[in-house]
């Protein structure tokens, strides 16, 4: 039996923030900040070279407001605006994706996570082994069978065992645990007084969120019982917020996501424009001048740079 083809889905939106905070400030000749673009581009180059996937796509958020905001207006309302130096880099990471000849996915009204869920299902239906490249715990609900994750910051593979270690339940029950525990980062309310550990214990006992809420009167701890009854609808709303949609729009079909050969002329032009000397050396191109970056920090992001590259 032949080995399954591999689909790699890269959480582009998640990675740009991590690259921005992991690398020191960098600017190109016109003063535009590019540290996140550098880390993002270096990671993608290494990732594709290492994995050699049959199919690939880089997935982005379009805007903060999605269908979840209609369900619960306070969803993610506590998040601050992105740093000023990061704003111009959002367009540049998309340009980097295209310069690397990689398919790009985004859909208004949906989060990148929903597109990843949708395409993971499509890959599964097509008989592909899907690898989700992300550090986002919210994507762990998708792990099953031939769908696994890679945390690019820690270079750590995540399967069902790792998900259960983090949440205390199997991947198919992660959504119910998150619905109970809530998430302060995304302003998902959950049920007061219930964290991940308690939520996992309850779901493991009662099987799922609906069964737990139906039998909340059986809970012995008075305050916990009271909260589960009083905030039952809040838990159901939270489940709608954390559950990833597998019916998001599909900008491309799977066949259009076959890993293409790089257009080296396009890539070189992009790297020259950004002053990414080290990456130009990596692809064997001549360089004139560039910007500087910390090789040690870049390596800590899981990106190994040539020892002879000098400064960017």
Question: What is each model feature region?
Answer:
Residues 230, 253, 257-260:
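C-terminal structured "cap/appendage" subdomains that terminate the fold
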Residues 16, 36-37, 47-51, 89-100, ...:
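Basic, polar low-complexity surface loops/patches
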Residues 14-15, 63-66, 137-139, 154, ...:
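Conserved nucleotide-binding/hydrolysis micro-motifs of P-loop NTPases
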Residues 257-312:
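Long, highly charged low-complexity segments
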Residues 2-3, 26-27, 77-251:
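Extended two-metal-dependent nuclease catalytic cores across DNA- and RNA-processing enzymes
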Residues 22-33, 97-107, 299, 305-312:
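Short, basic, glycine/proline-bearing loop/turn elements
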